[in-house]
Amino acid sequence: MRFAINLATNQNGLTGTNPSVGCVIVKNKKIISYGVTSLNGRPHAETVALKKCKNNTSKSTIYVTLEPCSHYGKTPPCTNVIIKSKVKKVYYSVEDSDLRSFNNSKKILSSKKISTKS
């Protein structure tokens, strides 16, 4: 998680109205990918990190600095991208204060048998 926080910190002020978020993907105790919210807030960190993995995320763990979004806005929900990637666990450090996502991702991911912890 510390690496994800460092990624987010380095991108502060460059993500428009979106928060700067860091994401790290770990499989078999090794970092296989990472991402950060892109310039002007899109794509989100989870999408950036998962795209780099090229479908190698089955049974992996995601560490992300903010609860993954679960609503349709200017991008599809990160929860959808996470579900399609077949990750096993998602850890996030802060719940999203946006009421469209607040605490929803835990419910959505858990319903798909993806363990979530904040």
Locate each region found by the language model.
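Short, basic/aromatic recognition patches
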Residues: M1-G16
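Helix-turn-helix
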Residues: G22
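A generic fold-level signal
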Residues: G16-N18, H44
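Zn2+-dependent cytidine deaminase-like catalytic core
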Residues: I25-S118
